[in-house]
Amino acid sequence: MGRPRKTDGLKPTLVRRGDKIYAYETTSYMENGKKVNVKRYLGVYDPLTNKILPKNENRCADRKKKSSEERAFRIIDDVECGDYGGVYLLDEIQRQIDLGKDLQRSFGSVSKLILTSGIALMIGNPRVYSIGNTLNHTWLRRYYGVESSLDSGSMTALTEQIGHSQANIDTFFSFRMEDCKDVICWDTTTHGSYTDMEGLAQYLSVNKDNEDIEQFKVGLATDFRGVPKLFRIYPGSLNDMQTVHRLLDDMDEFELANVIVTLDRGFLSGKNCKDIIDRDRRFVMPGKAEFKVFKTLLTRFSGSNNKVDMRYDDHIYSVMESELGLMRSETRKASDGSDAYDFTLPGMEGHGKDGMLKAYVCYDTETYNDQMQQHKLMISDLMERAGRIDSDHPVEVFNKLAGKAVKYFEVKADGRKVEVELKNNAETFFRNRAGMFILVTSADVTWSQSMTAYDARRLTEQAYNHSKEEDKRFRTPNKTRLNGRMMIRFISLTLKCEIAARIREANMVSKLDVTTCIESMNTIGARKYGDVSRLTEITKQCRTICEVLHVDVPTEVRENREICDMMALP
């Protein structure tokens, strides 16, 4: 006797998935001598009632297909549309700074793809391999007449090609550095990577983003306006001063003479200063108070009769100039085993025996007021937060909370609470140092030159801030593609910093930023039907942006442009 069936038709096939049992009707037929199985879904089988719950007709494949057909519409492809204003703005700016021209002279025909990728990266997507959507919704592809898809596969091939062309990259940098007649600012940072990139990325005990992944190092050179001119990639653990030696080699190769190199205070040491002046290069670095000679200079400043009021950028500073010498240390060596050098002041034994520098001690009343206000707010905030601590280890909690500021407090436990009091000399010590800074320079740098360089160094940090808005973690498998990716990102960063500089120079920082400029300009669209093309309406905001950035208001739709005036190329 056959088994009873659960339905009146064929015996269903039951399949368990998760906590549900699904029923199917399985049949077969012969086709070209082969057996073909056909499965039809019946519904969910309920073992308690021994019944099959009918399927939801609204969710079946046929229903979905019919619903999709009802929602479908024909895309009118004989009318072309796209965001135009942002593309137009960036093209006008890159022409003004000869970016496309330098790319064309360095890379030839592939330069158009490099510039297009950099502009697309800036407008739409922070990831190099995902710029295709930006090309589709903007006028960028039509603007330059780009045929390549620039999808992920194309970008992989492009970055590989660029990365292999280091000589072309160096030629491009040489053209960009031609404008650096007065100041070059240099700094380094680390970037995280999920791959070791053939040993380039390395684990560091400390990195700037506190990431538990391998890091590689990037050095960036900018001009006095904070616009990038050159980048270099290094292993993550490389000593920062080695990157400066590479920069000085580049300056020699590019024949940049009498240019002041500006570095962050992290580069300051007697040996580093000695290395730079031995290369016959001028430099400026902020001083660090932990050096004994600089503490002495700060102490001497208040009672000095050699202070003079100096004006820079419509601001008055009190300035004391002092000789600063270098002398080889008899008691220690540098980290690489070479000779170390100590700073000396006039009157010290052996002063200036191995080189002479300058130190400018500067005092700014406005900075003093700002720093005192910030200091008092910090003290008040920590005192308030200390009162809310309730822990088995209250002193440890407060120390972690206060960080370096713990040096201003006397701290002791009171049960689960913590008692904090200001140290007697804490306020006096901070007040005596507030508003003051020291600039260390080579012997032939004037105070006004050192201040110009000091301002420019701050703009280099802002350039890094722009770069960190992008994808900071890399998954690039090798350093060749990384080099190509960084080149495209460098184009994007150059345009960002140029726009930021123009906004700053127009005193419009409180009203505009780079993102606002691009997004506002992208409200200008382009439409083309057959041979007829036109722009959409242009707002007052867009006209203001064009005025601030020294760009003419667009009046026509442009297509198939070269990235520079090809007839003007040498």
Predicted regions mapped to residue ranges:
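An anionic, glycine-rich sequence signature occurring as long contiguous blocks
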Residues: E214, L230-I233, D280-A453, E505, ...
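Acidic, metal-coordinating catalytic cores used for nucleic-acid/nucleotide bond scission
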Residues: T262-K271, A289-K292, T480-L482
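Dynamic "connector" segments at or just before major functional cores
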Residues: M1-L200, G219-R232, S237, H245, ...
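Basic, amphipathic alpha-helical segments enriched in Lys/Arg and hydrophobic/aromatic residues
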Residues: N478-A500
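Short, basic/hydrophobic alpha-helical segments
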Residues: F173, M241-N258
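Short amphipathic alpha-helical "interface-anchor" segments enriched in bulky aromatics
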Residues: Q449-P477
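Secondary-structure transition/capping motifs at alpha-helix termini
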Residues: N32, T138-Y144, C180, F224-V227, ...
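Short acidic (Asp/Glu) and glycine-rich catalytic loops that position anionic groups and cofactors
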Residues: L135-W139, R225-V227, F254-L256, F430-V445, ...
